[in-house]
């Protein structure tokens, strides 16, 4: 009898271990593609033949991109100033053009796959089970999280920061929301810094690589990526990032996924120095990008 009880105990223990391993793999490793996104490149006919490209700039009749490197707070900061003739050139893309759990791809790979001119990493929605996910007016996830702030990119190219809790994605889409990204927080709202030195201590007080997007006025955007976690570049707190973007004149600015995800890609090359949590120079695979292109 004791042997049988011991045997059943071993069997139960093995089953429990197997189940636990499966849950962990299913949550963090196994890729599950729920929706394949067929992105039609409807803007090809607007592409201009008159293109001027340098190491840090791109210009045609519809798109102007200028990249400048700054050095503040013992940190290397890369700023892309983007001016568009139409909001259709501000776009987003999923890894492998598929929405789903653990579906990831490097920012550079997504940029190249979508013929982007410029790109940064997005909100890495796949790392969380909650948070609104809206792309190109399609609601992929409507489960909200407590008090997280979202970035709404409207069809006219304007940006807004909203509180996710209580937000109605269907109503937002009806009102013109094209993309909703869920990471945050908002850095600048209505031309005022929206974080303080003492707020959101878990994020804001740590110096890290950062990615952010902001808008100065109609179709005039600022993208910022900072290096961090190295002796050469310390990284920014959220307050330092917000202050920096405010000084650039943005009216709205929003913090995207940072840390090892922070990547700025331009015209076939990575501009910043992506850094893992272990201090290794390596580009991380993520769920999505925000990009400029036709």
Give the residues covered by each predicted segment.
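Conserved hydrophobic/aromatic beta-strand scaffold that supports enzyme active sites
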Residues: 77-81, 150, 186, 212, ...
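Short, solvent-exposed aromatic-acidic interface loops
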Residues: 95-99, 165-169, 226-230
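Zymogen propeptides
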Residues: 2-150, 160
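Conserved, well-ordered active-site substructure
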Residues: 129-145, 153, 198-215, 220-251, ...
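Active-site-adjacent helix-turn-beta-strand microarchitecture at beta-sheet edges
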Residues: 58, 123-204
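A short, polar/proline- and glycine-enriched secondary-structure boundary/capping micro-motif
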Residues: 100-103, 170-176, 206, 232-238
